[in-house]
A protein has these predicted regions:
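C-terminal lobe and adjacent flexible extensions of AdoMet/dcAdoMet transferase-like proteins
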Residues: 240-251
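Helix-to-beta-strand junctions that scaffold the AdoMet/dcAdoMet cofactor pocket
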Residues: 80-81, 138-140, 154-156
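Conserved class I S-adenosyl-L-methionine
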Residues: 59-68
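Conserved Class I S-adenosyl-L-methionine
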Residues: 173-199
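A short acidic, Gly/Pro-enriched loop at the edge of an enzyme's catalytic core
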Residues: 120-129
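Class I SAM-dependent methyltransferase Rossmann-like catalytic core
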Residues: 25-53, 57
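Conserved beta-strand signature within the Rossmann-like core of class I S-adenosyl-L-methionine
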Residues: 157-165
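A short glycine-rich, Lys/Arg-flanked "PGG" loop and its adjoining helix->strand segment in the class I
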Residues: 144-156
Length: 251
């Protein structure tokens, strides 16, 4: 009887921990700490589905590459708890402003800030690296370098999650640079070259309404709306871009 009670206790604790993890993610997304304008974009960016697909857990050491204004950082900073750590690898342009953002709230207590053009973390020390809508900024040598540093920082078996504006198959390199859309083929090619294995793809962030032939590239669409009021209703109806969602693994 005593053994049976112990078994029930263990099962209860395990179930509770699993529920707590899921609840924490939901709470992190619903948190009042988030910038209201960011939260309104959940309908396009699907943070719950995306982070669940990647499999990020709150006790992991996670590197977010080039978080920019911190759209995902606000969620991850609330979600990741001791002994987990979030490392924000920020581009030089955003570093000073991001320091102020981190000093503005206690939720950034487990966030470390490093330069994107660094080694990111100690070799083989990170559980997960993620990047959201950044590859078009790195096309060329920068992308190779950042993927290489990400691979080195990850533990064997660690994961690399990528979300990026998706170009039509066969789109040439110069068009990718000017339009802000990158082909899946190119993203996968660069990752494999650095030693990653492709684990899975998801259509969580797909948008079949996006024709990808807009006058100002991906920036024609929300949230940028580069044409201002020209065809605004049309582009708002399309919504945010069609995106690939890829999961890689370090062997």
């Amino acid at each position: 009887m005593r053994k049976l009670n112990l078994l029930f206790l263990v099962l209860f604790l395990l179930t509770g921990l699993s529920t707590l993890s899921a609840h924490n993610l939901e709470e992190s997304i619903a948190s009042s700490d988030r910038t209201p304008a960011f939260a309104t974009r959940d309908v396009y960016r699907h943070p719950h589905e995306t982070l669940n697909f990647f499999g990020i857990e709150p006790d992991m050491t996670v590197v977010e590459l080039n978080p920019g204004g911190g759209w995902y950082t606000e969620i991850l900073a609330n979600y990741i708890h001791y002994p987990g750590t979030l490392i924000a690898a920020q581009g030089s342009y955003y570093l000073e402003g991001f320091k102020k953002k981190m000093n503005s709230s206690s939720m950034y207590g487990r966030v470390e800030l490093v330069n994107l053009n660094s080694t990111l973390a100690e070799p083989n020390s990170v559980d997960f690296v993620v990047t959201f809508r950044n590859l078009h900024n790195w096309l060329g040598a920068d992308m190779d370098s950042i993927f290489k540093n990400s691979f080195k920082a990850l533990k064997p078996g660690g994961s690399f999650g990528v979300v990026e504006h998706r170009a039509k198959p066969g789109t040439d390199f110069e068009t990718m640079k000017s339009s802000g859309y990158v082909t899946e083929e190119h993203a996968i090619e660069v990752a494999l070259k650095q030693g990653f294995e492709l684990v899975a793809k998801s259509e969580i962030n797909a948008n079949p309404k996006d024709t990808k032939d807009h006058p100002k590239g991906v920036w024609t669409l929300p949230p940028r709306l580069r044409l201002d009021d020209v065809d605004r209703v049309k582009y708002e109806a399309i919504g945010e871009s069609d995106r690939m969602t890829l999961l890689f693994r370090k062997p």
